[in-house]
Amino acid sequence: MARLPKLAVFDLDYTLWPFWVDTHVDPPFHKSSDGTVRDRRGQDVRLYPEVPEVLKRLQSLGVPGAAASRTSEIEGANQLLELFDLFRYFVHREIYPGSKITHFERLQQKTGIPFSQMIFFDDERRNIVDVSKLGVTCIHIQNGMNLQTLSQGLETFAKAQTGPLRSSLEESPFEA
């Protein structure tokens, strides 16, 4: 079996869900009687469709997850993770404004996992560029996290273990 990362890190906005939690929706959030997560105005708030399956797959492979987000809406982001029942998939959460470098340095300190044993999924190129400099295998997300992106990301990670590390911006199987 191919080598697996020791930690899979996910951005939140436009990676797990299709919005910016600090501008496009209106916290606080709640779960309605039909199980739908809604914001203060009653607007439905959803994950990208395959996100729960992606996280279950990683869990079944024994790969722990973490969240790393630069949002200023810290409480709202954590509330959504709880309402979507995603806390169980994330052993650590680094959710606060600032550089993703700081998020990863703290994740490395908390877990003891080397950067080279981490994989990171994010929709913003600047984060991919910054974090890849640490030696993390970085995967650029274009239309939300899905199973195909996970499989391609794990393949990229496995290849990086046998050669020089690179981000998916250089040779991306996700871009047309």
From Swiss-Prot:
InterPro entries for this protein: HAD-like_sf, HAD_sf, HAD_SF_ppase_IIIC, MDP-1_euk, MDP_1_eu_arc
EC number: 3.1.3.-, 3.1.3.48
Binding site for substrate: W20, R70
Record has Transmembrane helix as a keyword: no
Domain of life: Eukaryota
Residue sites binding phosphate per the record: L12, D13, S69, R70, K100
SUPFAM superfamilies: HAD-like
Keyword tags: Hydrolase, Magnesium, Metal-binding, Protein phosphatase
Protein name: Magnesium-dependent phosphatase 1
Source organism per UniProt: Homo sapiens (Human)
